[in-house]
Amino acid sequence: MLHPSASKHLWLALSPHGYGHAAMTAPVIQALRRRRPELRLTIQTALPRSFLDERYGSDFVHVPEIPDFGLKMLSATNVDLDASAEGYRRLHADFIGLVEGEAARLRDARPDAVVANVPYATLAAAARAGIPAVALSSLNWADMYRHYLGDRPEAAAIWAEMRDAYDSARAFLRATPAMEMPSIGNVVDIGTVARRGRNRRDELPGPAAARLGLVAFGGIDHDLSMARWPRLEGWTWASAQDCPPERDDILSWRELGLPFADLVASVDVIVTKPGYGTFTEAGLSGVPVLYVARPDWPESPAMDLWLMAHTRALAVTVEEMLGDLESQLRTLFSLPSQDVAQAMGNEEAAEFIDRLLLAEVGTCESS
């Protein structure tokens, strides 16, 4: 339903833990803006404005300071446990004061509603300021914290503040696929939130018979150097990593001039790690995925099963991939095709947020 004359202000807080939280939220905001073309948007995140412009357009106010950090990482797949624990000790040393400071920021901005993917301090601040708020994500930092750091002496007190902050929201919209969330008492399950890319292979340079792969490990550097990447006859690789100048078969994905979701839909294979954005965009396009298994990551079981249900997918180790990439690709391409996914969660989340902007949403029962 359109509300063309009702200009509402939405505050969107995004975890800067890689690019996935911002990427998965963008199609929801696009769906919301179709309902509310006059929506005023503020995005609070430490992510670069240039990336946000690619996903959200330029019509928003950017607040680049946010207390949330998610987890400190050694690489795209390895958590720095000690640095993460220290980060949370500092964040919670005066959590009440931190929340009050963020609440004052919200009071000054006067948004009609807050959406968080998935900074919990922002949710606690919204509750403190009396502003309706909702969480949206496939993970939450309370259960992530307990999984990786729950044995630390300070963990019980920190986890309790995280849990209470999440539970202060009107609901936690858990996007499919998602981790189990035993800490969260207000979960509402929704469908997949993602953008379906458009296959634009005919716009890309090079001979039509050439094979094109995308190597993308998200917004956090991977410990895999592209200088070690195997050279395969007939293949060119678009990479989000640094491209070695001596390799004529590797180029930056940005040189191809396509939005990331369109590039995902245009390649022959994606090489990646388990991550909501890349997995779901691949599942919506049916593009085969070769990925580095991540058994310690709590999202992985659900994401792996979902991906295998919607496209050909094969989990490998870095050593297997670098040792015999051609054989791994042959195995991947021999798997049966699957039915591509649908992104039903975009409109489901937009409908919930639209009602939240009108303060028509009450506290939701756990699903």
Name each model feature, range by range.
Residues 113-117, 259-302:
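A donor-sugar binding/catalytic signature common to diverse glycosyltransferases
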Residues 144-222:
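A nucleotide-sugar donor-handling region in carbohydrate enzymes
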Residues 326-367:
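C-terminal amphipathic helix plus adjacent low-complexity
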Residues 22-32:
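Short amphipathic alpha-helix
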Residues 2-18:
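Nucleotide-activated donor-dependent transferases that construct or modify glycoconjugates
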Residues 98-163:
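Conserved nucleotide-sugar donor-interacting segment of glycosyltransferase catalytic cores
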Residues 16, 39-93:
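Conserved nucleotide-sugar phosphate-binding/catalytic loop shared by glycosyltransferases and other
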Residues 29, 193-269:
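Donor-nucleotide binding loops and adjacent catalytic segments primarily
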